[in-house]
Amino acid sequence: GRTAQVNGLMSVTIQIPGNPSKFAATKTGPYEENEEIIVKVPTTDETPLDLTRLICMVNVEHNCYVTPAVGGEMDFTNPYPITVVDALGNKHHNTIRVVPTPPKTKYAKLWEKNAALLNMSSNTTGLAFYQNYLAIQEYNAPIKLYDRNSGEFVKEIPAASTFMMRARTDDAGHLITNRENVYGAGFMVYYYSEETQEHINLLNWTADAGCPDDLGYNMSVKGDVTKGVAYIYGMCPHNMEIYYWKLEDGQLVTPDAKPNVLRYGPAGGDWTSAPMIQRATLEDDSKHYIAYNRYSGATGDDAAYKAKFSMFTPAYEITSLNQDNHEYRILGFNVFNIENETYLALNDQQADTWSGGVSTLSVYDITDPSKMELGPDDAGYDKFCLFRGEWSPYATSYNSWGDLTTAIVPTDTGYDIYIATCVIGGDTSQTTIRMYKMTWYRQ
């Protein structure tokens, strides 16, 4: 004989009037007696979900029915009780709760100011989030701190030395700055002590000891430079080498003048501006992220010299971002983790005959690294490329200078991620700093 249909309710779907999308319950039936069935329906600040006007559709087993019947627009301000009578006449009781759910991420530009408005020169070469400020290292000048929410000037910190280039923060929040090796200055790295309000030298590779020209054109750190294991990375243009030093409890393990060297042959030739490099973890077998430019000042139309962003393992297993996802030059990037997810924020710029172009910020979900191969026309691209901002003002940038930095701030519903970008132009009207906020909602 046939099996009687005694499970009753099998699925629930909610629809917003006038919207073709349908939103299924977080789990399908059969359901336990008195089990609450949850349906998450998108909401935004701009178009908040109206719980009083929703369409409910249910699927029940054959010879089962809902009493009273559902249909038309219904009110889900409170959990909605539903009763299903099965083929044997048994009643099954459940409630349906609609949960307004923000999108996983949303984005807002908080402010935009050129160097003139920030009272700085055009060479705003280093960006770092330090405490609640945006710290800007002006090249060969002091560090200025700005309110990260408004862009208003707060105070100034004297530079650690001359020819200071980049600003970073380590994993413990210390402000780290570096000197570029120009005119024989040497590559020097400092952290700023809050206690003494002094810059403390961590690394000094002198020109006389063989430091390459322009080392410090880019720099990054991983770990806490004052305790435990940490790493400092220094890069320079016109080669294919990445230099790095290991520290333990604030002291160099790697001698100043004898850094570890990674030769990045996959670049296929010398990069023209020092690459951005980021170590993923403190583990010995950590992967790295790298972005480099081979653009040399000609019109940016030679595909062989277009910038590249890649992830590589110690064995040089490489996964690269599809180059259709960015403009000809990459000015800066940061890879950051939110709980179990990994995101890439990328600052790129076009390149015309005059080494100029507009710049923009984009954000990608690279939790699954294979998605990095997706292009704008591929299926699933909208789940990979989460945001692309508007163009900056045009900037002439012969050195391909720019930067990007992020700060992650926990909230009751998830996290706010501040993302600051800069493109450095030929004068103070072209150099532009922008502040964005990415809001990540726990689903």
Please give the residue ranges for each predicted region.
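Repeated scaffold domains used in trafficking and secretory/extracellular systems
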Residues: 117-128, 158-174, 178-180, 187, ...
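Loop/turn-rich, solvent-exposed surfaces of beta-rich toroidal or solenoidal domains
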Residues: 325-393, 404
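Beta-rich interaction/scaffold domains
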Residues: 1-123, 372, 390-397, 441-443
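Blade-level signature of beta-propeller repeat domains, shared across WD40, Kelch, NHL, RCC1
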Residues: 393-443
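Entry beta-strands of beta-propeller and related beta-repeat scaffolds
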Residues: 131-135, 172-177, 226-233, 284-291, ...
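Beta-strand-rich domains and repeat architectures in extracellular enzymes and scaffolds
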Residues: 113-141
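Structural motif
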Residues: 140-147, 182-193, 229-251, 273-274, ...
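Beta-propeller fold detector
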Residues: 105-117, 145, 149-162, 190-211, ...
